[in-house]
Amino acid sequence: NEKYDGAIRLREGLAKSKNLVAIRVLKHIDPKYALDYITRFGFDQKKHSPYLSMALGVGQVTALEMVAAYGVFANGGYLKQPYFIEKIIDVKGRKIKQNFSLTNEETPRIIDPRNAFIMNSLLKEVINTGTARKAKIIKRSDLAGKTGTTNELVDAWFAGFNQDIVTVTWMGFDQPKTLGKHESGSRAALPIWIDYMRPILKNYPMRELETPHGIIPLKINPINGLLAEKNENSIYEYFYDEFLPMENAYFLLN
């Protein structure tokens, strides 16, 4: 957006789609490690390259792959394979074939439930304060997701979910070309998602992902991310219990 916001937290960077935040995270963990890691989510390693551009979504994915991947954050860490056809019946109503959703116990858990919980929380911020805040019109607190826009506005994405439903919308041309000025994920793909999900969600009660054991909410200084002093402005953030911030801003200044 041609605006420099200075140092910001990962939560804020993700919500506002700040590319440099994602690039620095990827650089820290190493692109080769990330390339191996994404195969857990069902992505084809051959369609991605171990470079920093991975952080910007450079690579080839399908909407169905995205549904499976975001489902991991929705259900607490399990990889479930989506399917197109639930049931086939003949003209006499006899069932010829039926697909069934596997339970969590029947599917592999590919990430720590704490990881899934924190990612769920971060992706909620995208709707609460970030690029997908238009989705607040649905008036639910259990929605999370992420907008996506490729170079030259060729593709517009929105992947959004709650515990019951994952929906991914994509807009683009069969033969890649620009969608037009300002046709980003939040402008082109998100409205489709809202129109589709709003009536469907009326059939599902709001459910928040349960906080797993080993997650600690702490008050931190929003500027530096360290523990907050008692009387200073602060916000809550979630941490693994083995990776709690041990220092506060006052300690560092003195």
Predicted regions and their residues:
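Acidic/polar loop patches that form or flank catalytic/metal-binding clefts of enzymes
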Residues: 79-83, 128-135, 200-215
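Conserved catalytic neighborhood of penicillin-recognizing serine enzymes
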Residues: 1-34, 79, 91-118, 123-125
